[in-house]
Amino acid sequence: MIREKVTVSTRTLQWKCVESRTDSKRLYYGRFILSPLMKGQADTIGIAMRRALLGEIEGTCITRVKSEKAPHEYSTIAGIQESVHEILMNLKEIVLRSNLYGTCDASICVKGPGCVTAEDIILPPSVEIVDNTQHIAWLTEPIDFCIGLQIERNRGYILKTHHNFEDGSYPIDAVFMPVRNANHSIHSYGNGNEKQEILFLEIWTNGSLTPKEALHEASRNLIDLFIPFLHMEEENLHLEDGEHTIPLSPLSFHDKVAKLRKNKKKLALKSIFIDQLEFPPKIYNCLKKSNISTLLDLLNKSQEDLMKIEHFHIEDVKQILGILEKHFAIDLPKNQF
């Protein structure tokens, strides 16, 4: 366990990890402070950060199991101590860490007797198990235990749908939430108009992320939410007599395209985000992971730069070039492949 003495800066806004410990392979704890803040700022940041930590961070789960030997979810299989339902619940608890995009397949194939644990899961290279000792099933007889698994990376939670059980495929309620809990508290100091605040933030994770990693990802997600407001252009708004409201009329995507074609200002480039460019999910996720969020970011990359992105192929680059040509009649610098 690491614990540091809390020292408060009186000038520059600073954050610091003041306590960090690992209670188990599946329970990490971290405590952070941010100071000095003006009165009211700590609560604003604390509420937003807690919501982002609990709801905006992606996690990886087993979402579906396939077995030809199980007639239904509540059946039992000869030679296995647990029912099918109990095995599904054990698989639901497996904690995974990954840089996966979308879904992938995994499997278990073990011969009894013996204990089946998370260590027996055959995974793709992009996925790893946090705790290999997690129990899945007990095989009491010399039988073959072979099942297929679907693994998915997402956020929030997804409730299983009760259909398509005839092929031996069983969906699992998935909780894509690596942060188990998050709390914030506020300490005030100073007098009168000089009163300031310290924000204390506590984070518990399931081991797939450290609290510091979770804090970084939550902060990045919050920043992404506010970026559009930084790039809004000021427009001349006129009020008629008796009007007390100003209608906001942000540029539509097609307006931005027209403006880009006309003068190609950096401001227009910055205000077009890649989620507006009709990219397939794989391309969009890969670009976001590489910190490419706007059209300006993309145009600053060459074709060779894009080919260096993990999981990217020449077909993906060609698709990006086609979309840029379609909407903007522009191209990325060409390289020889």
Swiss-Prot record:
Gene Ontology process terms (BP): DNA-templated transcription
GO CC aspect terms: chloroplast; DNA-directed RNA polymerase complex; mitochondrion
Family that this chain belongs to: Belongs to the RNA polymerase alpha chain family.
Subcellular location(s) per record: Plastid, Chloroplast
Subunit: In plastids the minimal PEP RNA polymerase catalytic core is composed of four subunits: alpha, beta, beta', and beta''. When a (nuclear-encoded) sigma factor is associated with the core the holoenzyme is formed, which can initiate transcription.
InterPro entries assigned to the protein according to its UniProt record, in alphabetical order: DNA-dir_RNA_pol_insert, DNA-dir_RNA_pol_RpoA/D/Rpb3, DNA-dir_RpoA, RBP11-like, RNAP_asu_C, RNApol_insert_sf
GO molecular function annotation: DNA binding; DNA-directed RNA polymerase activity; protein dimerization activity
Region annotated Alpha N-terminal domain (alpha-NTD), chain positions: 1-233
Function: DNA-dependent RNA polymerase catalyzes the transcription of DNA into RNA using the four ribonucleoside triphosphates as substrates.
SMART domains xref list: RPOLD
Entry's free-text remark on domains: The N-terminal domain is essential for RNAP assembly and basal transcription, whereas the C-terminal domain is involved in interaction with transcriptional regulators and with upstream promoter elements.
Annotated spans, Alpha C-terminal domain (alpha-CTD): 266-337
Keywords: Chloroplast, DNA-directed RNA polymerase, Nucleotidyltransferase, Plastid, Transcription, Transferase
Keyword Membrane among UniProt keywords: no
Domain of life: Eukaryota
Membrane-crossing residue ranges in chain numbering: none
Catalytically driven reaction(s): RNA(n) + a ribonucleoside 5'-triphosphate = RNA(n+1) + diphosphate
Name of the featured protein: DNA-directed RNA polymerase subunit alpha
